[in-house]
Amino acid sequence: MNPPTPLPALTEQQKLLELVERYGRNLHSFMVFEPGLSIWFGEDSAIAYTAKGGYWVAVGGPLCAAEKSVDVLQEFRSAAQKHGCGVVFFGVTQPLVDRIADTDFDAMQIGLAPIWDPADWDNVVRGASKLRNRLSKAKRDGIICRKLSLDELQSGSETRETLCRIADQWAMSKALPPMGFMVTLELFQHSERRR
């Protein structure tokens, strides 16, 4: 009996998709697919980053099991140090900040990203007058929110062209560098997997 043929190694994109599906739990998880970012792979983990000014600046936290996140951060830092670089983690979640509290990593809050639980949306709106005002204005302006089908996002579709135009106008209206890599818009890559 012949030994089984080994499966081909997963490509980097396939590995990332698998890690995002298993461990993608925050705002920046899908940014691992954005152009211009490097990917560091650990064992069953990955971190997207860019090299800036002697640092590896990570985009969000690691894609890994939550209980392994501190170990993964330390492995990433060791890899950066081998290249003469320090590390900075930008756009991480509060649970990760809490996990590093008793380590030699430091944390500093720079800003907040609004995050809501869709199951609790009615309570969120009830408790936020500014949000209610913005939603009312959007409604008066005829803006609606709905889930798009994959067909509507196909290359050449009117919806996709409109979304591209809106995204381009937004990006051109912002002064993005030096942290522009945090807001690169690659709206349609792996759109069938985005939630």
Annotate each predicted stretch with a short phrase:
Residues 3-57, 62, 85, 90-106, ...:
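A conserved beta-strand-loop-helix scaffold within acyl/acetyltransferase catalytic domains
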Residues 66-78, 87:
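Conserved acetyl-CoA-binding loop-helix of GNAT-fold acetyltransferases
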Residues 110-121:
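A glycine-rich helix N-cap at a beta->alpha junction
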